[in-house]
């Protein structure tokens, strides 16, 4: 699909737009991640080694459509953030400039925040992001940045509670643990629950800025 512009257009027109229009007022749909870990599509022969240009075209068109039809946020869960969403002079494959160029200058072709992933095997790239700022981690800092995927059991030598609090203190805008239902050895809600409850207790106004414990129905 990504290698065919017509098929990208068909996906956006026939799926992305109807989906967004249908659910744009649902308070539970706050963001759409347009692709999980596209790094592997680019690097791994088994995943096609698809050029970034083709992936960028898809993201640009889909993001522009989502922003045209809704206020839903858009991101891409890049696995190796310091490698592919790096601050200058590094390479940011999903920068505003790149995406606009793939969408004929459409300013709506953009991400709303970055969401790099982190697992301990990635420590050799630029160490553990929880214990440094996004800038120190080497990321482009022109948007908010969320750690979009991390083991629910926490990073090496740290508890999830330590990871969450340190991410906040270092200026990260959120953390999303993998996974809720324990499909692998990375953990489940049982592991990350104490961390999220501790964070809520320490920063309740931040977690519930409107004083509501659940989105209005």
Predicted segment positions?
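Active-site mouth of glycoside hydrolases
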Residues: 1-111, 121-125, 140-143, 154-178, ...
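Substrate-binding cleft of secreted/luminal carbohydrate-active enzymes
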Residues: 116-118, 143-217
């Amino acid at each position: 699909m990504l290698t065919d512009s017509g098929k990208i257009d068909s996906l956006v027109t026939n799926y992305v737009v109807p989906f967004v229009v249908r659910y744009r007022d649902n308070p539970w749909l706050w963001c759409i991640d347009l692709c999980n870990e596209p790094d592997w599509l680019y690097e791994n022969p088994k995943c096609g080694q698809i050029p970034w240009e083709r992936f960028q075209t898809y993201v640009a068109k889909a993001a522009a459509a989502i922003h045209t039809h809704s206020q839903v946020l858009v991101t891409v869960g890049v696995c190796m953030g310091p490698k592919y969403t790096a601050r200058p002079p590094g390479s940011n494959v999903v920068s505003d400039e790149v995406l606009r160029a793939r969408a004929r200058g459409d300013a709506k072709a953009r991400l709303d925040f970055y969401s790099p992933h982190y697992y301990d095997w990635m420590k050799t790239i630029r160490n553990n992001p929880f214990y440094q700022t996004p800038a120190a981690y080497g990321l482009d800092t022109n948007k908010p940045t969320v750690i979009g995927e991390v083991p629910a059991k926490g990073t090496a030598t740290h508890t999830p509670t330590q990871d969450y609090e340190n991410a906040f203190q270092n200026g990260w805008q959120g953390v999303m643990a993998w996974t809720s239902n324990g499909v692998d050895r990375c953990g489940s809600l049982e592991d990350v629950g104490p961390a999220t409850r501790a964070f809520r207790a320490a920063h309740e106004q931040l977690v519930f800025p409107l004083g509501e414990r659940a989105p209005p129905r």
